[in-house]
Amino acid sequence: MAKSNSKDIVLIGAGVLSTTFGSMLKEIEPDWNIHVYERLDRPAIESSNERNNAGTGHAALCELNYTVLQPDGSIDIEKAKVINEEFEISKQFWGHLVKSGSIENPREFINPLPHISYVRGKNNVKFLKDRYEAMKAFPMFDNIEYTEDIEVMKKWIPLMMKGREDNPGIMAASKIDEGTDVNFGELTRKMAKSIEAHPNATVQFNHEVVDFEQLSNGQWEVTVKNRLTGEKFKQVTDYVFIGAGGGAIPLLQKTGIPESKHLGGFPISGQFLACTNPQVIEQHDAKVYGKEPPGTPPMTVPHLDTRYIDGQRTLLFGPFANVGPKFLKNGSNLDLFKSVKTYNITTLLAAAVKNLPLIKYSFDQVIMTKEGCMNHLRTFYPEARNEDWQLYTAGKRVQVIKDTPEHGKGFIQFGTEVVNSQDHTVIALLGESPGASTSVSVALEVLERNFPEYKTEWAPKIKKMIPSYGESLIEDEKLMRKIRKQTSKDLELGYYEN
């Protein structure tokens, strides 16, 4: 693709991934024309919404599924290092947006919050202690604390310790104070507003992309429908970026590119218990993750989270899975069935055969009553009362199912997946956690994979936004500490000030 002074790019969806990519693109190529189309009436209504995302501030500080017990008994923390670095990269970009004036008032979307891991039982306690020792030895996590003392835990997680005094059992906890809670809905709204203000960008709500056709010159003709009037129009563009969350797979299929063929999706809703009693909410001030039950997928890790929503402190426990055919919370009951094609049906069937435990888990979760959910909560908070908690359905995640040389047909991919056409004109983001927390790294991956001819030109611009770009926070301890101190200042977190 030959370079020119100006290109057109269509961004589908006004969630955190599209707005992150758009915010980055308008800074490195201010002359490009950005067209954002969102089918709903405002940004961040689906999975990016603060009431819909399952967890926030994923930095591998407390999420035990990022540190894996090996057959020899050791703990592999490599994935935790990567996730932590990616979150540090996100914080740098957000800090840049604040410093440049693109967004304001960072404490409206990010707040300091301790991250705590909590386990019960002899084997889990051994795992947590071994994890602590492995992480403590690495500079990224050397501020981690560990205890098996119930008196210390009463100070860290007083609400969870209530009712355990007579029979505490075997338990342990680890803590890193320098964690965060991120309101991705508010962050997304701020970035969307900033994109709207850009002279070469348009953000149109109630506009749904319904079809694609690639022209002979390599450009794409994108058909857009105004959902209020029913009128359709065509937008010609050089690039198409599909950041539409659960709606990405059907849109990718409509492009007809070969890379869309052996892909499918398995939609899962998250359900949470939300506390309605302010007196209970005030007694918990942390993000506390447990360990997933044996034989269940990583999405099942239970956590009791302090979250800041609409400027108010809230308390959520979950997730509980709720399977249904919709790919989006505001989608159609036909979404799943329409996504089944002749070219991916064997992929989907293979996934069903290979993942019977996941299917059983999902079915068990669907039939679980509120009382069943409350019983799970009481393993964290023994004195939880039914009247203080309300069960609600969060957003949709669509687990990517694909064929791979390594795993064969029907492999379920956890995490975020970037799919692009061979000519790099179509880019789609599929999947889920830790998507939002690592959204900036995902945007960088999109840029590097799909715009290689701009790499040299863009590198200094990216480094201005993300000072660690091109360097490793995992390998360079001095740089890592410098970056953390700077982002804490930029985002008004109050860490590392001594």
Swiss-Prot record:
Domain of life of the organism encoding this protein: Bacteria
Pfam family, one: Mqo
Keywords: FAD, Flavoprotein, Oxidoreductase, Tricarboxylic acid cycle
One GO molecular-function entry: 2-hydroxyglutarate dehydrogenase activity
GO term, biological process aspect, one: tricarboxylic acid cycle
Reaction equations catalysed: (S)-malate + a quinone = a quinol + oxaloacetate
EC number(s) reported in the record: 1.1.5.4
Similarity section: Belongs to the MQO family.
Keyword Flavoprotein: yes
Needed co-factor(s): FAD
Listed name of the protein: Probable malate:quinone oxidoreductase 2
SUPFAM superfamilies noted in UniProt: FAD/NAD(P)-binding domain
Pathway(s): Carbohydrate metabolism; tricarboxylic acid cycle; oxaloacetate from (S)-malate (quinone route): step 1/1
Xref: PANTHER family: L-2-HYDROXYGLUTARATE DEHYDROGENASE, MITOCHONDRIAL
Cited Gene3D superfamilies: D-Amino Acid Oxidase, subunit A, domain 2, FAD/NAD(P)-binding domain
